[in-house]
Amino acid sequence: MAAIISDKFRIFNAKQFLESLTEGPNDTSAERSRMYFFVGRPQPWKAYLEIHTKNSTAFVVGNEVYVGTYGSTAFRATVAAVYDSALLLTDVFGSNGVNSAPPLGSALKGRSGGSGGSDTGATAVSGVYRYATEDVPPLPLDNQTEKYGLYDEMIAAKRITDAFARTVIRRYNWDLVANPKFDMWKPDYSATPGGGGQIGKQTATGATSIADAKFYVMNSSYEVFKCLYNGEDPSNTTGQNATEEPTTAGANYASATGLYTETTGAGYIWKYMYTIPTDDVLKFLSSDFMPIVLPANASRQATVALATAGACDVALIENAGSGLPASQTLYTSIKGDGTGGIVKFVTNGAGAITSAEIEARGSGYTYANVLFANGNLFSNAALSSAVATGASAVGAIEVVLPPAGGHGSDHETELNGKRVMTNIRLTYSEGQGDFPVDNDFRRIGIVADPYNYGTTTFATADTLSGLKSVKITGASADFSVDEKITQTVTGGTAYGTVVSWTLDSGSTTAGVLKYIQTTDAHTDQGVVRAFESNGSNAITGESSTASGNVDTSYGSSLLGVTFASGLANPEIENNSGNVIYVENRRLITRAPDQIEDIKLVIEF
């Protein structure tokens, strides 16, 4: 079955993403999407290996694990951390170098001392394996288990509004060294399949669809123009190089139509689309992409107001022909389902066409033809003075039709806006401390419609904390970020990893400890146990040896979260909403005096 998913579908989805940010009567309406940009993963990337069916001998940090025969093993690595059902690994090696991997269900063995050492007796069966290092983050997985992990490692989230998102398109600057020639808009580009049976039409730069064409440009004043004509004629079938930078300033620009016409060189015709305002330049202009302004932008609205459905702007000479009335300037009506269109063309002494242009744009055309038979040619634009045409006269002029609605009527569709860029600025400890500044993160993403913690109510706040927190009193020393913390609790031991430690103003012993708990690193007898509001059982740091008690009397808001009996939950309900975008990155380090502008480009 022959079928395609068209670019229009992708453009539609990009439009829907942006429109969903403001739809509905209020912030909690079902029509509106509450999108949040989140950061997470404070702990370093290491290779991850699930294990099961362990024997009674434990794997040891610093020892190796391997599969097969040690001297010729297909996989071996150094143990960096040991969990109940997984290992973190470094220094991966084997028959395929760092790309070596233990097949699912492999017999895994522990070893100390390397080639001169011996097996430790520790064994297990291998499960899912994912290679990663700080320089090579793992590819995200699109499954439910991964989603649970995203929430466990989430640090904070910031609301995405329409002020932080734009449709973007590929960036093409006015630069005649990098971009000497541009494609022109045509409605009928297509590919020529390798198997035959179809002959398509390519653009000047070899693209097989308008979606892949280089047919627009941003000038030095951040004005965006679309190329309607690039000098194509029978002698230059792929067009010619541009010579003049299009601009809305000067005599070559016609404000009544929004067209800029070159008066030198190939005679390029450009359609003005919009001007990117300074704020959008700063937020959404990158080395690869440039924004389409919002519909409310004044320059865009002016362009939309000029759009005329089915108006014709370009006439191409397909075949210069011969035998037409010689050495004349001639006019003919554009035949089709529209009205008012007129083509003007000039012939030489042999009756061949030497130039052609649109005299009157007309409107309403979805197909168009230019006829040269007797009775169709005139010597004046009013089409009142007929010129006889001989029976042997031949030639061909193509009228290039605009997109539906006319040029400038639908910017996203016309410019192939199938990508959305979000630009999120994290300013210091944004959200009164929701975004800690004393740690780093390695994951960014977007979650749609998360709930407030402990509810089924959509979150609407500007920022949300994804961390658990405890108010500490009587700390013996400073806790260290990324260290493991423990507390004796009912039924066993609670474990966590420190994300942030912030002393109270003027204190050296009291502060807020923010942490994560994951199902891999923080289980006790198969269970992730919660830290308790117990002033007698201290919380202790593994590497710092810091020890402090829960301030069970504390019940105020501090650093973006609200405490009850010294404990504070995240502000995001675990596993709520839909994670629609995830990107694993190298570490991004935060600092108290630092601002990050993070750009995400989502292609639909």
Feature names for model-found ranges:
Residues M1-V39, Q43-K46, R130-V136, V224, ...:
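N-terminal intrinsically disordered, low-complexity, charge/repeat-rich segments that act as generic
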Residues I210-Y229:
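Elongated alpha-helical scaffolds
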Residues W174-L176, F225-K226, W270, L324:
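Aromatic/pi-system hotspot detector in well-structured domains
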Residues G40-P44, A132-S209:
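Acidic, glycine-rich low-complexity segments with interspersed aromatic residues
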Residues Y229-N230, T486:
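GIY-YIG-like beta-to-alpha core
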Residues K46-T133, E262, A266-F604:
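Conserved, function-critical positions that sit in or immediately flank catalytic
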Residues P180-A213, P234-K271, A356-A360, Y365, ...:
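Signature of Asx- and small-polar-rich beta-strand/turn repeats characteristic
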Residues M1-R32, P44-Y48, T133, N143, ...:
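Short, intrinsically disordered N-terminal pre-domain segments
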